[in-house]
């Protein structure tokens, strides 16, 4: 599932909806945008910890902000850090989540939704969660 969820409430909503489908496990790929509301980061980490089985924490338009600082903010209130994999490269995080998943599992890729760029240090790089996920899924076997 791809979703634009970028607030604690929207992340909770998509993960709760996926839980209603009775998945074996939920794998979540998400991050928080840089140079944006820092107060939502720790609550988003808490939602991810509560509602996902494994979380692949990654970049989501870091803009001019240090990505590791964003990760630190997200992880501030997390108590089960073993549920989290920190992977700054978003494509790699998506690939890892798909690689970890098996039949009956759901992978939720949240935060960017329809966006087709990744903003970093003033540069807009072409980037589409949808295209990347589709590419890996079409391979049939992820290598």
Which residues fall in each region the model found?
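ATP-dependent carboxylate-amine ligase
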Residues: 1-143
């Amino acid at each position: 599932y791809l979703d634009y969820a970028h607030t604690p409430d929207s992340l909770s909503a998509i993960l709760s909806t996926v839980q209603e489908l009775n998945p074996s496990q939920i794998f979540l790929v998400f991050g928080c945008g840089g140079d944006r509301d820092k107060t939502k980061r720790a609550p988003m980490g808490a939602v991810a910890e509560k509602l996902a089985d494994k979380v692949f924490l990654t970049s989501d338009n870091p803009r001019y902000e240090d990505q590791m600082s964003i990760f630190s903010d997200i992880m501030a209130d997390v108590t089960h850090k073993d549920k989290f994999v920190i992977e700054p490269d978003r494509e790699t995080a998506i690939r890892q989540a798909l690689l970890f998943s098996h039949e009956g599992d759901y992978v939720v890729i949240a935060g960017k939704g329809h966006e087709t760029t990744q903003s970093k240090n003033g540069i807009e790089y072409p980037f589409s969660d949808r295209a990347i996920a589709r590419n890996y899924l079409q391979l049939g076997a992820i290598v």
